[in-house]
């Protein structure tokens, strides 16, 4: 459990009431990762949602050749910094991560249990709607950023 005041610092949670913040804080914890440690891995079950507090992480797109188990390539997409959200797949079916996120520097994050957050949404549909609205905004921002990076890569 963390203090609801920690969540209040993030615009993503700006819509939440005190009671909602308290409920989410109950299913959250602060976690730390050393440089090079993996926060979440592509194709694995999306069990958690993360908000970066300190440090930076690399957002990697992973290509696996399922016919040849030794063939795996990682492509660096972007780097995330404090305030960014990662692991939104924990809120979107089929609840599997679509990328790998690895600590670029020593990193501290708020980790929220995905199953518990989804359970809160099942009970409170208004919370679910507002949470999904914020999740959609985060996904759209990520898509926009990726398009810019792709355009820049093609321009060179």
Indicate residue ranges for each PLM-predicted region:
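Cytosolic regulatory regions built on CNB/CRP/Popeye-like sensor folds
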Residues: 1-156
């Amino acid at each position: 459990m963390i203090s609801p005041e920690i969540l209040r610092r993030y615009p993503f949670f700006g819509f939440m009431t005190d009671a909602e913040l308290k409920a989410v804080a109950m299913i959250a914890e602060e976690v730390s990762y050393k440089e090079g440690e993996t926060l979440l891995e592509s194709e694995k079950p999306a069990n958690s949602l993360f908000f970066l507090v300190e440090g930076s992480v690399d957002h990697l797109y992973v290509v696996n050749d399922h016919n040849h188990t030794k063939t795996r390539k990682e492509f660096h997409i972007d780097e995330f910094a404090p305030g960014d959200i990662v692991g939104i797949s924990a809120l979107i079916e089929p609840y599997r991560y679509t990328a790998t996120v690895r600590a670029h520097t020593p990193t501290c994050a708020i980790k929220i249990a995905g199953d518990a957050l989804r359970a809160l949404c099942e009970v409170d549909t208004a919370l679910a709607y507002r949470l999904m609205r914020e999740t959609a905004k985060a996904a759209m921002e990520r898509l926009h950023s990726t398009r810019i990076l792709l355009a820049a890569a093609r321009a060179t």
